């Protein structure tokens, strides 16, 4: 089972974006985020919500960039 990591206040372009990642751990979610978006600082300062024990394959689930 993986966890869902819901990241808010990321991918900012005037307004905040959001990313959802399924991963075994926060460290694994960070690796997925940095590989896709090349922005470790964005991950490190994100607002997190974690939903534990979901039946979803590891990886990037969904994302939306902020915009204005």
Predicted features and spans:
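A broad, low-specificity signal marking well-ordered, structured residues that form hydrophobic/aromatic
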Residues: 5, 21, 62-63
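Short, mixed-charge low-complexity intrinsically disordered segments
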Residues: 35-68
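Short aromatic-glycine-(Arg/Gly/Cys) micro-motifs in beta-strand/loop hairpins
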Residues: 1-16
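Intrinsically disordered, low-complexity segments enriched in glycine/proline and serine/threonine
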Residues: 11, 27-29, 55
């Amino acid at each position: 089972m993986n966890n869902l990591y819901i990241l808010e206040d990321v991918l900012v372009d005037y307004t905040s974006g959001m990313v959802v990642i399924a991963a075994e751990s926060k460290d694994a979610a960070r690796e997925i985020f940095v590989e896709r978006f090349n922005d470790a600082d964005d991950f490190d300062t994100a607002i997190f919500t974690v939903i534990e024990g979901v039946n979803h394959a590891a990886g990037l689930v969904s994302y939306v960039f902020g915009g204005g």
